[in-house]
Regions:
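Histidine-dependent nucleotide/RNA phosphoesterase domain, centered on the 2H-phosphoesterase fold
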Residues: 1-205
Length: 205
């Protein structure tokens, strides 16, 4: 049997983060998608029986695409210019469907892969190029990005086997969702959760 890496808390303060500080980033969100809601419900019993996991409600379900920077380090003028560039570039892309799931255990999360990767990578490239239209240096690496959606975040250290067993007992669940927009959000993690206000939604096509 393959040994699973132990769980650890996701909520350590990464460099630059603190209470009251927020971050501009591009995400795909799913609050209006019935299939995403069903998927959250399908896995809800697993999270309910595991207090070491903080569940992500549908409202805050997201696929992280591309960061810009902390809001106190990025001018509103640059934000506006990046949005305008993103609107132009995303107009050349078409909406598409992706499949989320099934869920698996990760050291800090229960997460679900999102496939196919290619259309998502095209959206991310458009966003990166839009940032590059405004700034000389685009933050974050172009390579190594794995599109995923997290269902819950670990809040403590401990063995991963009980989490994996609970997921296995629940069975594999997936959802097909439509991606027709990408959102620039103002993200915070003040309350041991990722919460945000939307700055602008940019449509594809």
């Amino acid at each position: 049997v393959t040994e699973i890496e132990p769980m650890r808390s996701h909520w350590w303060w990464r460099p630059g983060w603190r209470i009251g500080r927020s971050f501009y980033t591009w995400h795909i969100t799913f609050a209006e998608q019935a299939e995403a809601a069903r998927l959250v419900d399908d896995y809800a019993p697993v999270l309910a029986e595991l207090p070491v996991l903080d569940p992500v409600p549908l409202r805050w379900l997201h696929l992280t695409m591309q960061g810009i920077g902390f809001t106190d380090e990025v001018s509103r003028g640059d934000v506006g210019r990046i949005i305008s560039a993103a609107q132009k570039r995303c107009a050349d892309l078409e909406p598409f469907a992706v499949t989320i799931g099934p869920a698996h255990v990760d050291p800090e999360t229960i997460q679900m892969p999102v496939r196919p990767v290619e259309p998502l990578a095209a959206v991310r490239l458009a966003i990166r190029n839009a940032i590059g239209d405004v700034w000389d240096d685009v933050p974050e690496r172009a390579e190594g990005w794995r599109p995923h959606v997290s269902l819950g975040y670990s809040n403590a250290a401990g063995p991963a086997e009980p989490v994996a067993a609970a997921l296995a007992a629940r069975g594999e669940h997936v959802a097909e969702v439509r991606v027709d927009a990408v959102s620039l959000i103002d993200l915070n993690r003040d309350r041991q959760a990722y919460e945000w206000t939307e700055v602008r939604s940019v449509t594809l096509g």
